[in-house]
Amino acid sequence: MTFQGKTLLITGGTGSFGNAVLNRFLATDIAEIRVFSRDEKKQDDMRHEFQAKLPEAAGKIKFYIGDVRDLASVKSAMVGVDYVFH
């Protein structure tokens, strides 16, 4: 299966499962991976980690602050998304 040109949203993306999913999809031809979580500090730490260890892939990762219990934040993060890992 090819993910070329596709966008993935990972809810709870800064947790251990979300991090594993992120690392798995960075090895594909996916266009964009959105990390959706409530914790801005963890997102900032993750951003810096990937910029340091995989600078060529870090541009694929976008970060969205939100909560799955808040419909507006979910709708905002979902625009243009092809796949969701929840």
Please give the residue ranges for each predicted region.
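Conserved Rossmann-fold cofactor-binding substructure of NAD(P)-dependent oxidoreductases
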Residues: H48, E56-Y83
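Conserved Rossmann-like nucleotide-binding pocket used by diverse enzymes
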Residues: L9, R34, Y64
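N-terminal Rossmann NAD(P)H-binding glycine-rich loop of SDR-like oxidoreductase domains
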Residues: K6-T28
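Redox-cofactor binding/interface segments in oxidoreductases and associated redox assembly factors
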Residues: H86
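Short, flexible hinge/linker loops that cap or flank conserved catalytic cores
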Residues: M1-T2
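Active-site catalytic pocket residues across diverse enzymes, especially alpha/beta-hydrolases
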Residues: F25, D29, F50, L54
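Conserved glycine-rich Rossmann-like NAD(P)H-binding loop of the short-chain dehydrogenase/reductase
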Residues: D29-D45
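Short, well-ordered alpha-helix to beta-strand connector turns
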Residues: G5-K6, V81
